[in-house]
Design a protein with these regions (language model features):
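A short alpha-helical cap/connector motif
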Residues: 1-124, 131-153, 157-194
Length: 194
């Protein structure tokens, strides 16, 4: 892994953390994924050799940068969804600053609208958005996740267990899927077809 990338991404993460600490309103905070979780995403994408990646919940693009860093190696294309236009623009600028923007399509969109309309199949999906919508998203996620080797990763399942418990049970109750929780960062829920 490039020491230059690690130094730049760490500095950016520290800026985002300082922003979050200055805001008590949850919706004003950036709420980026933890570095150890982001590093795992990088490894998973490389191991899987992902070609088509979907990120639901761009925020300011910290996780997007990690996805794009891995996408360089696998020649993947990322579509990332963010409902807040300002955050999406900041994420895009961060990708430009890291020279990773060529791997990412930034869409300002309601995730449920996108999921309902898309006909694409993705071999890697990161779900890190407003948790109260996850059960609704599940109506569409199985149709767009590739059946052979596709992986859905959901963040914050340990730190916000009570908020995602219905979603976790909904997925676990579907016999078509294998799941596990990794106690990394805020907790990652991994989902794949059997």
């Amino acid at each position: 892994m490039s020491q230059n990338f690690l130094a730049k991404i760490d500095a950016l993460y520290q800026q985002f953390q300082a922003h979050d600490q200055a805001h008590s309103d949850r919706l004003k905070r950036y709420r980026n994924i933890e570095p150890e979780s982001a590093e795992l995403l990088n490894v998973l994408i490389r191991a899987q050799q992902s070609k088509r990646i979907l990120e639901i919940g761009t925020s300011t693009g910290y996780s997007t940068l990690w996805l794009a860093y891995a996408a360089q190696a696998t020649l993947a294309k990322i579509t990332t969804l963010e409902i807040d236009a300002e955050r999406s623009e900041l994420a895009h600028q961060n990708a430009v600053d890291f020279s990773l923007d060529r791997f990412v399509e930034f869409l300002v969109s309601d995730a449920q609208d996108y999921l309902r309309k898309t006909t694409e199949k993705f071999d890697f999906i990161l779900l890190d958005a407003e948790r109260d919508a996850y059960c609704d998203y599940w109506n569409y996620l199985p149709q767009i996740l590739k059946e052979k080797g596709g992986l859905l990763v959901v963040d914050n399942v340990v730190s916000h267990e009570s908020e995602v418990n219905d979603f976790l049970n909904l997925v676990r109750d579907n016999p078509k899927f294998s799941t596990t929780i990794l106690p990394i960062g805020a907790g990652l829920f991994l989902v794949t077809y059997n």
